[in-house]
Structures are given as structure tokens and as C-alpha cells.
Design a protein with these regions (language model features):
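Extended, small/polar residue-biased N-terminal targeting/export presequences
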Residues: 1-58, 106-108, 112-122, 133
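Structural motif
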Residues: 76-78
Length: 215
């Protein structure tokens, strides 16, 4: 297939750079990535992470009330196979396209879990997943805690809802936790920064031609 050959050629070129941050996406992989950053997609409802050296794929976080949680997936689980695909032999962005799919369809996953001698075999029914990218709670001494798991389209709105809720509870200071946040939309980041920083230039992007965009 000519399209497959072309995709393989470009993937090989990017892998040859030896730069883990330079990746070629097929049309399907790009659409999957954009769906995840939109905040809504059809899949299982889990955040995945891949070790750049071993290629091992792990469950970083399972969202509440999702197919992944209902099937029994847990944070820290290791994905061994998706259907008949060895997870560690595929780039994460491509593997995700096999995990997501139409509502009501199922995906079979083989899971390794610490403390379990045998692999777990799970059939998970895909459903609509609305990603909660912000969680919050009030700590002692009127300290608010806000964790942002990724920067998607609804993140700024969710962030301000958390801020206002904590203010209503008497928040006097705040901790913003970005640990394990893989990134996302730059505009989502700058919208949040506009909410909490004084007016002025926060960040800018500039391409090789000198075209600059201020935020």
C-alpha cells in the first residue's frame, strides 16, 4: 500500500533523528491526538505513559466513571498487549489509535500488575470519555490545592471553577500541581496564566523565519 509505505518512510526519517520529541503522525494518529486534547473522545478513559528507553507502556491514571475503571484497570498497570499487538513494539501515539474506537465496541488488553503472577485479560467496552483535567481540594491552613493533569480545551474553564470553589471555602494561598502533566494546548496554558499573572507578555513562539506570536 502506497500510503503505508509513505508513512513508514517518514516515520523512519524522524526516528533517525534520534530525538524523542520529534515524531511523525499519520492522519489517524493526528486525529486521535487532537481528540484527546479536545477534552472529549471515545475510548477507555485512561492516561498512558511510555518509557522512551524500554518502550514499556504503563497506566499513569484511570479516570473515574470510565470504561477503564469499570473494567478494573489501575494506576501503575503495564499494558502488555492490545488485541494481538505487543505494546512495547509500537509508538504510544500509534498504540492509542488501536485502543480508541467507536462507542459500544470492545478492545482486548493483556495487563501485567504488580503482585499478580499471571497476566490479566480484560475486554473493555469503549464509551464517550469526558476528560477531567483539573482536580482540587482544600488543605490545612486554608491552602488550596489544584492539580492539572493536561492542558486541553476545557482546562481553563475547569481551572477557574476550581479556583472559585476554593475561594468560597476560604482559600488564602494555593498550590498548583503540574507533576506528570504531559502538556497539551499552548493556548490553554496561556489562558490560565492570564487569569493569575499581571497583564503583559507571558510567553511567545517564533518560527525559523522570525514570525513571532505573543501571548
Amino acid at each position: 500500500d502506497k500510503a503505508d509505505l509513505t508513512d513508514g518512510l517518514y516515520k523512519g526519517l524522524f526516528e533517525g533523528l534520534g530525538d524523542s520529541y520529534s515524531v511523525y503522525y499519520t492522519k489517524e494518529e493526528y486525529e486521535s491526538m487532537m481528540a484527546s486534547t479536545s477534552g472529549t473522545y471515545f475510548g477507555i478513559g485512561a492516561v498512558l505513559s511510555q518509557d522512551v528507553k524500554t518502550m514499556q507502556v504503563s497506566i499513569l491514571h484511570v479516570y473515574e466513571n470510565t470504561p477503564a475503571e469499570k473494567a478494573g484497570l489501575k494506576d501503575g498497570d503495564v499494558i502488555v498487549k492490545v488485541e494481538d499487538i505487543n505494546a512495547a513494539e509500537m509508538e504510544l501515539s500509534e498504540l492509542v489509535t488501536h485502543i480508541r474506537g467507536d462507542k459500544g465496541t470492545t478492545v482486548h488488553m493483556q495487563i501485567a500488575r504488580e503482585g499478580e503472577a499471571d497476566y490479566l485479560e480484560l475486554d473493555i467496552e469503549r464509551d464517550k470519555v469526558e476528560v477531567p483535567t483539573v482536580t482540587s481540594e482544600m488543605l490545612d491552613n486554608h491552602i488550596g490545592y489544584i492539580a492539572i493533569t493536561e492542558f486541553a480545551e476545557p482546562t481553563e474553564e475547569q481551572f477557574m471553577q476550581a479556583v472559585n470553589s476554593l475561594k468560597d471555602q476560604g482559600m488564602e494561598s494555593v498550590i498548583i500541581d503540574l507533576r506528570d502533566n504531559p502538556g497539551g494546548y499552548l493556548t490553554a496554558v496561556t489562558e490560565i496564566l492570564d487569569d493569575i499573572l499581571p497583564e503583559g507578555l507571558t510567553v511567545y513562539t517564533e518560527d525559523k523565519y522570525g514570525n513571532r506570536q505573543n501571548y
